Amino acid sequence: MNLHEYQAKELLEHHGVPVPRGGVCDTPEAAKAITTSLIGQGAKLFAVKSQIHAGGRGKGTFKSGYQGGVRICRTADEVYESAKGMLGNVLITKQTGADGRLVRKLLVAVAPKIKRELYLAILLDRATSRPVVMASTEG
């Protein structure tokens, strides 16, 4: 099963796990509206994240030349401009290959202060039919 980040966050939140506030959008205007709402709740820093089924989004490059499928922004206008650069464009990462993936949705969320970043995956070991939890400092 492949889930976008926003879908995984919805599942976690549904089961009581705290996740950063935010929303999903498919237009720059909607991205700005989400940001304006978050500003009204006291947020000051925002993550704009391309939603594709591939890792390495932050270091990715769009076919249009726009850099980075994950951007940290300080204002609603910056979020709007980032959304314009991402939505409807093809993001190329190490995992997508040269064809890349079309970005149709963005996650706009409050950006937490990051002290340390870890990547977590739960996989099914087919040999033992058991889940395997993997953690790494790199995605």
Region roles according to the model:
Residues 1-37, 41-44, 50:
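A conserved helix-loop-beta module that forms one wall/lid of the active-site cleft
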Residues 5-13, 41-61, 92-114, 120:
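ATP-grasp fold ATP-binding core
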Residues 8-10, 32, 55, 79-80, ...:
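A broad, structure-centric signal for solvent-exposed, well-ordered loop/edge residues
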Residues 19-22, 48-82, 119:
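Glycine-rich phosphate-binding loop of ATP-grasp-fold ATP-dependent ligases
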Residues 25, 72-75, 123, 134-135:
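Short beta-strand-to-turn element immediately C-terminal to the catalytic PLP-Schiff-base lysine
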Residues 117-139:
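Flexible glycine-/small-residue-enriched beta->alpha junction loops
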